[in-house]
Structure formats: C-alpha cells, structure tokens
C-alpha cells in the first residue's frame, strides 16, 4: 500500500486550509492511480516528504508528481 507523508516545519505556521488543499490535490493526482493508499499532511519538527510501499523507480515518479503539484498554484485555496 502506498503511503505519502508530507510534514511542514511547525515553525512556518502553514494554515490548515493549505494543508487540507495539498492533501486533496495529492489524493486526486496521485492516489487515484493506486488501488490502496494513504496521504498524511501535517506539521512536524522539520519539513520532509516520505514515500513508502512502492519500489524505488515508482518513488521517483511519485516524487516528481509531488514536485509538480507543489510548483503549481492551481490547488491553493
């Protein structure tokens, strides 16, 4: 099962609506291609992205899609 975890640095104070919008966009653009998957977006002690449950080649593809989502502003509320 695919798992995507996105953590924002808690000191950056990213609004909850931004986190929710990012989660929804990841679910729409990435999870829709997988039978099972989980996306978690929240705050942590540092900014990080982790992907598990897929092989290394698939991780690279997913990471590129995540970068494309992040660089696009169409998902921002």
From Swiss-Prot:
The keyword Phosphoprotein does not apply. InterPro entries: DinI-like_sf, DNA_damage-inducible_DinI-like. The keyword DNA repair applies. Keywords: DNA damage, DNA repair, Plasmid. One of its GO terms (biological process) is SOS response. Belongs to the DinI family. This is Protein ImpC.
């Amino acid at each position: 099962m695919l798992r995507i975890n996105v953590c924002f640095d808690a000191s950056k104070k990213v609004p909850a609506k931004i986190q929710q919008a990012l989660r929804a966009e990841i679910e729409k653009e990435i999870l829709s291609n997988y039978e099972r998957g989980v996306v978690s977006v929240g705050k942590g002690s540092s900014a990080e992205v982790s992907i598990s449950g897929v092989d290394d080649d698939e991780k690279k593809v997913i990471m590129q899609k995540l970068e494309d989502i992040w660089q696009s502003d169409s998902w921002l509320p």
